[in-house]
Swiss-Prot record:
The keyword rRNA-binding applies. PROSITE patterns: S1_IF1_TYPE. PANTHER family: TRANSLATION INITIATION FACTOR IF-1, CHLOROPLASTIC. It holds the Pfam family eIF-1a. This is Translation initiation factor IF-1. One of its GO terms (molecular function) is rRNA binding. Keywords: Cytoplasm, Initiation factor, Protein biosynthesis, RNA-binding, rRNA-binding. One of its GO terms (cellular component) is cytosol. Residues 1-73 form the S1-like domain. Component of the 30S ribosomal translation pre-initiation complex which assembles on the 30S ribosome in the order IF-2 and IF-3, IF-1 and N-formylmethionyl-tRNA(fMet); mRNA recruitment can occur at any time during PIC assembly. InterPro entries: NA-bd_OB-fold, RNA-binding_domain_S1_IF1, S1_domain, TIF_IF1.
Length: 73
């Protein structure tokens, strides 16, 4: 998925869609993060709805924000 070595990848569920392609995601470990859609998902018009399972990349510097990189089928 990502070429970056210092990111943390976790799975979660979309709990709330927000404006400007932002989403509130409930991670599998119970934490909630604010995540936006990655650029490639925007370019390919991949739609994300409430309840979808997604893969989220988190930065080790700010664990409250993330980037959605994959939507599971």
């Amino acid at each position: 998925m990502s070429k970056k070595k210092d990111v943390i990848e976790m799975e979660g569920t979309i709990t709330e869609p927000l404006p400007n392609a932002m989403f509130r995601v409930q991670l599998d470990n119970g934490h909630e993060v604010l995540a936006h859609i990655s650029g490639k998902m925007r370019m390919n018009y991949i739609r994300i709805l409430k309840g979808d399972r997604v893969l989220v990349e988190l930065s080790p510097y700010d664990l409250t924000r993330g980037r959605i990189t994959y939507r599971y089928k």
